[in-house]
Structures are given as structure tokens and as C-alpha cells.
Amino acid sequence: MNFQGKVVLITGAGSGIGKKAAVMFAERGAKVAINDISEEKGKETVELIKSMGGEAAFIFGDVAKDAEQIVKKTVETFGRLDILVNNAGIVPYGNIEETSEEDFDKTMAVNVKGPFLLSKYAVEQMKKQGGGVIVNVSSEAGLIGIPRRCVYSVSKAALLGLTRSLAVDYVDYGIRVNAVCPGTTQSEGLMARVKASPNPEELLKKMTSRIPMKRLGKEEEIAFAILFAACDEAGFMTGSIINIDGGSTAV
């Protein structure tokens, strides 16, 4: 996969899957706009890419509030926008009784409104250029029920609806839209939660027990799927949902 000359905007790229994807895009020639709500983490990703000889810039912004400015700044910095990766998201825990209206509003703002508006402004730019790609990072929770992930599941299912709708609406403009659905992934955030638990070994065992492969996913495995969904070699793929979950949604 070659992304030479492509400009990629990745939200939530200060850590985790977003950071890994940013590095992998840069390794393959892309210019990467790193968006994150944490200036410190976002700039760390930028410096990492630059240390490898790649090209990147930090674009500060809250996806729920600053979508138009995030896209505008990316285009001002690099002159165009070829690929948007809607990766930023939050993971609240709780069933419907444990979920407040405030929790619902915040989750939907970050996980749905943000990608919706970013896609809206990205599409406007991509139409001018003659095409582009949007990749939405959803979740296995958007496909199956997972205990105490109520509003998270709602938000990630909504992202799949957005993916299919955009794919149909903009196919004639050369814009492809796909989604990836990661399973439980060995990210910085998850492992911090495991280590902070009363019994880390038991929690990890519980997490992997429901996965047919009996292990957690790796950040690079999810990032690779994002790159594939965005690459020119996947030019006939749009409106597709890619599961990377060790078989969890197959049982």
C-alpha cells in the first residue's frame, strides 16, 4: 500500500489505534494531520513521525465542537484532504439504568456528532478534488451486545449507519466510505485499566475468554485494516464493514 502524496486526517491520533495508524500511513508516504484533544499527546505523535523522516502536523480540536475548523486547518496546512479517519471516541461503561442523560449526550457528541460533521466538511473538500476516502472506526459493540456498554453500542451502531449512508450518497463523486469494527484491543488505555483492577490477571482472562482466538487484538492489526480500507488497491470497496475481532462477532 502506497500513500505517497496523500493527505490523511486522523482524529484521536495522540494515542492508541489512531497513533499507530498515523505512523503506518506516514511510513507509506502520507502527509498526516494529527488531531487530538490533548496537545501534548498529539504533538508527541507528530514528533515521532518527523523523527522517522515523515511529514505531519498537529491540528488541535474537539471533534464534537470544532469539526469545521479541524478540516479547514488540515486543508490550509497541506493543501488538500484525501483520507479522513474518524477514530476519536470515548467508552462509557454502564447499562441503561446506570447511564445518565449527560453520559448519553457526551458520548453521542464525540462518537457520532463529531464523525458526522467531520465527514460533512471533508466531503465538501473531497468533491472539489474529485474524490477521497472516509474510514470510520466503529466497534464490535456496534454489531453485538456487550454487557454494560449500552450507550457506547448505540453510538457505534450509528456510525455504521453513517458509513453506509455516505457510501451510497457520494459514490458518484469518487468518495469511498468504509468502517472497521475492532474487537477488544491491547491499547494503552485498556491495559492501564487492567493494571488498575484488583486482579489484573483475572480480568485479562475474562476479556480473552469470549474471543475465539483467546487473545486481545494488537493496535497494528486494527491500523492495518484502516489503511487497507483507505488504499487505492481497495478501490472497489465502499459501504463495507470490516471486523477485526478474533472471531467474536462470528459466534
Curated annotation (Swiss-Prot):
Catalytic residues (UniProt): 152 (proton acceptor)
EC primary class: oxidoreductase
Its EC number(s): 1.-.-.-
Key words, A-Z: Oxidoreductase
The keyword Oxidoreductase is annotated on this UniProt entry: yes
Residue ranges that the Swiss-Prot or TrEMBL entry lists as coiled coil: none
Cysteines paired by S-S bonds: none
CDD domains reported for this sequence: SDR_c (cd05233)
Domain of life of the organism encoding this protein: Bacteria
Binding sites annotated in the UniProt record for NADP(+): 10-34
Residues the record lists as binding substrate: 139
Matches recorded under InterPro entries: NAD(P)-bd_dom_sf, Sc_DH/Rdtase_CS, SDR_fam, SDR_superfamily_enzyme
Gene Ontology molecular function: oxidoreductase activity
Presence of the UniProt keyword Oxidoreductase in the record: yes
NCBIfam families found in the cross-reference section: PRK07231.1
Homology family: Belongs to the short-chain dehydrogenases/reductases (SDR) family.
Protein name: Uncharacterized oxidoreductase TM_0325
Organism: Thermotoga maritima (strain ATCC 43589 / DSM 3109 / JCM 10099 / NBRC 100826 / MSB8)
Lineage of source species: Bacteria, Thermotogati, Thermotogota, Thermotogae, Thermotogales
